[in-house]
């Protein structure tokens, strides 16, 4: 029993039948599992990574995220806010959605730094901090996903029902929709929190992130339903574009639009699927009998996996600026005008304009069905 407790203290799982009884040792009264080399060999022998190996892998992935994805998400979302606000007199309905989406994504990207440095999942051991972080992240997670879903629906309505929806797709209704989305995001977080908090007031280790009902709601309302709506809307958009371009024969324009649609759906699915699969596996597993209440969290048992899926989910907020704005002609033109206004050096203007064209070439095709940055 002493050996098992020491092994668990080092993050090693001991199962019946995985280790044979050691031969009697007359030179040492007990087996010293505190030695790092012996602990690592035991971990490797059972097919698991040692705590040090998990830390190194998590640190490496965190460095990759911080160096490559975080700057794209942080700078990209700030540029979306600054450029669109600078041209507020020319702001369109999709621009309003872009601004609100950028706000939610920017907060998520900033919060991701906390997760990057949370390699040992320390804040999950502090009930107040764990609950606060979970509430803050869920509000912005829901708002980001809800805005992506609503933008997909709005794009389909704009393309397929252009004549009928002209009276309803106004800036006033767009602002109202943004307000309702933020209210829905807050309600989807605070209402379950209030309900479950009343049931767990006597638990010292209660954390909002570990409540099964909340996790089921997060998987359903934060992934399954939005992905189904996004997939349905963009499949209908594809059908509209195929019909429109089939009569005009503009295949390059159609292929560009279809590639952007494919990128939108794939990025959302790839980034959010690991997080929701991780939560679903936890929900489908039964809690081990006799486990301490504070150690029943699935993240305690699999800290490295939890760290990886969190970084993947944050990556969606980093990639959204590239997909929704920088790949769109409207925003690129606004960005070029913004650079020209803020800089007085003609050479610098020409360099920035050439750089934008080199990275994302302009499209010269024309079409009656405009598939702009609002896709």
From Swiss-Prot:
Residue(s) carrying N-acetylmethionine: 1
Keyword field contains Hydrolase: no
TM ranges: 67-87, 97-117, 128-148, 176-196, 218-238, 261-281, 308-328
Biological process according to GO: adenylate cyclase-activating G protein-coupled receptor signaling pathway; apoptotic chromosome condensation; cell differentiation; cellular response to estradiol stimulus; cellular response to glucose stimulus; cellular response to mineralocorticoid stimulus; cellular response to peptide hormone stimulus; cellular response to tumor necrosis factor
Glycosylated residues, chain numbering: 25, 32, 44
MF (Gene Ontology): chromatin binding; G protein-coupled estrogen receptor activity; nuclear estrogen receptor activity; steroid binding; steroid hormone binding
Gene3D superfamilies cross-referenced by the UniProt entry: Rhodopsin 7-helix transmembrane proteins
SUPFAM superfamilies named among the record's database cross-references: Family A G protein-coupled receptor-like (SSF81321)
Post-translational note: Ubiquitinated; ubiquitination occurs at the plasma membrane and leads to proteasome-mediated degradation. Glycosylated.
Ranges per topology, Extracellular: 1-66, 118-127, 197-217, 282-307
Entry keyword annotation includes NAD: no
Coiled coil: none
Keyword tags: Acetylation, Apoptosis, Cell cycle, Cell membrane, Cell projection, Cytoplasm, Cytoplasmic vesicle, Cytoskeleton, Differentiation, Disulfide bond, Endoplasmic reticulum, Endosome, G-protein coupled receptor, Glycoprotein, Golgi apparatus, Immunity, Inflammatory response, Innate immunity, Membrane, Mitochondrion, Neurogenesis, Nucleus, Postsynaptic cell membrane, Receptor, Synapse, Transducer, Transmembrane, Transmembrane helix, Ubl conjugation
Family: Belongs to the G-protein coupled receptor 1 family.
UniProt protein name: G-protein coupled estrogen receptor 1
Species per Swiss-Prot/TrEMBL record: Macaca mulatta (Rhesus macaque)
Upper lineage: Eukaryota, Metazoa, Chordata, Craniata, Vertebrata
């Amino acid at each position: 029993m002493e050996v098992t407790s020491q092994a668990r203290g080092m993050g090693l799982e001991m199962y019946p039948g995985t280790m044979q009884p050691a031969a009697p040792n007359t030179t040492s009264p007990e087996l010293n599992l505190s030695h790092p080399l012996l602990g690592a060999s035991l971990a490797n022998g059972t097919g698991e990574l040692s705590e040090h190996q998990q830390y190194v892998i998590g640190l490496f992935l965190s460095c990759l995220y911080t160096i490559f994805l975080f700057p794209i998400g942080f700078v990209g979302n700030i540029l979306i806010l600054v450029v669109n606000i600078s041209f507020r007199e020319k702001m369109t309905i999709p621009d309003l959605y872009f601004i609100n989406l950028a706000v939610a994504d920017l907060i998520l990207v900033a919060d991701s730094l906390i997760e990057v440095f949370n390699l040992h999942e320390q804040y999950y051991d502090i009930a107040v901090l764990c609950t606060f972080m979970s509430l803050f992240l869920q509000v912005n997670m829901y708002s980001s996903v809800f805005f992506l879903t609503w933008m997909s629906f709005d794009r389909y309505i704009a393309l397929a029902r252009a004549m009928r929806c002209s009276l309803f797709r106004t800036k006033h209704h767009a602002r109202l929709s943004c307000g309702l989305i933020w209210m829905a995001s807050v309600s989807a977080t605070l209402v379950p929190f209030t309900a479950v908090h009343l049931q767990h007031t006597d638990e010292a280790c209660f954390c909002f992130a570990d409540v099964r009902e909340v996790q089921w709601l997060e998987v359903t309302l934060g992934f399954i339903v939005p992905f189904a709506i996004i997939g349905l809307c963009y499949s209908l958009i594809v059908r509209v574009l195929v019909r429109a371009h089939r009569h005009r024969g503009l295949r390059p324009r159609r292929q560009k639009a279809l590639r952007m649609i494919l990128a939108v759906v794939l990025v959302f699915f790839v980034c959010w699927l690991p997080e929701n699969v991780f939560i679903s596996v936890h929900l489908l597993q039964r809690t081990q009998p006799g486990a301490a209440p504070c150690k029943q969290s699935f993240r305690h048992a699999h800290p490295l996996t939890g760290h990886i899926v969190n970084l993947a989910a944050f990556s969606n907020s980093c990639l959204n600026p590239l997909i929704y704005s920088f790949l769109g002609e409207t925003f690129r033109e606004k960005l070029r005008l913004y650079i020209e206004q803020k800089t007085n050096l003609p050479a610098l203007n020409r360099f920035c304009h050439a750089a934008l064209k080199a990275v994302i070439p302009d499209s010269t095709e024309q079409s009656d069905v405009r598939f702009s940055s609002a896709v």
